[in-house]
Amino acid sequence: MAALAPPVAAIRRAVRRALTTLPDAGPVLVACSGGADSLALAAATAFVAPRLGRPAGLVTVDHGLQEGSARRATAVVDWAHTAGLAPVEAIRVDVSERPGGPEAAAREARYQALTEAAGRLGAAALLTGHTRDDQAETVLLALARGAGPRGLAGMPTRRWLGEALLLRPLLEVSREQTRAACTALGLAPWTDPHNTDPAYARARVRSEVLPALVRALGPGVLDNLARTARLVAADTAALDEQATVALDGVRHPDGGLCVGGLAGLAPAVRGRVLHVWARELGARPGALSHRHVDALEALVTGWRGQGAAYLPGGLRVFRRAGRLTVVDPCPPA
């Protein structure tokens, strides 16, 4: 018997670790584009899940952005059936009328489709093939836009996606390993042309910035960027817990926040309290930026009698009688 290729073994171990942490015995789904990362993940899941007594299926999303995308989706479905995965679905989405750039629109449509599929199929978890290299790219993009700790924490290994857990088992596996695993298993992954299209910021980071960093600083830079994300994520989680407790301590019975209590908090905790409160008020996470939180902060620590701080959705926050008070958007005339 031929020895198991080390990349294949590494990916199977990563999948086993992820699946053994699931409390629910329900099925898992792999989100698979047909690229090397998700294909290697799907192959590992098809091997590991049955040995843990867990059903495993696959979902592929066709964004319709490239010629032949429907054929690619059909090829993924056909392979999944031969690999023993079930249920298997291909979902076509329309990204043409969604707001934002094409990357953001495709991502939003994809995750909406995956969330609906996981709910419809009763999945306990949805697995995606994001790798260490994806994590390094995410950290660099966050640095470039001046993100805070939450952005520098990168992609979490798990989070809720509707009623299912979204798992990223391969965040400590390199892209080189997923490609090598596909080669060892005789799989022919699809290459997404968008991954090398310089019109996209992530593609430029992937093809230009990361290779330059590796040449200048050595190959360990990718591991170190991913490690930074893990360390920052741990610190962020601890601060978030403190902020949850602190928020309860500064709430006013009318739903506002007591300025005196806010002023006594450490700045890192206070910023999180204001961010969480703004989300509770209805500000969408994707629209809520550091500028909105800074405006709330100014009502606490930079008070000069100024007017309202404005939040996404038309919400207005005033400082009145020693507390922050929200006013709903004005109704249309």
UniProtKB/Swiss-Prot annotation:
Which UniProt key words apply to this protein? ATP-binding, Cytoplasm, Ligase, Nucleotide-binding, tRNA processing
The organism sits in which domain of life? Bacteria
GO BP annotations of the record are: tRNA modification
Q: Which ranges form a coiled coil?
A: none
Q: What GO MF annotations does this protein's record show?
A: ATP binding; tRNA(Ile)-lysidine synthase activity
What the entry lists under Pfam families is as follows: ATP_bind_3, TilS
Keyword Electron transport found: no
Q: What Enzyme Commission number(s) apply to this enzyme?
A: 6.3.4.19
Q: Which residues bind ATP?
A: S33, G34, G35, A36, D37, S38
Q: What does this protein do?
A: Ligates lysine onto the cytidine present at position 34 of the AUA codon-specific tRNA(Ile) that contains the anticodon CAU, in an ATP-dependent manner. Cytidine is converted to lysidine, thus changing the amino acid specificity of the tRNA from methionine to isoleucine.
UniProt protein name: tRNA(Ile)-lysidine synthase
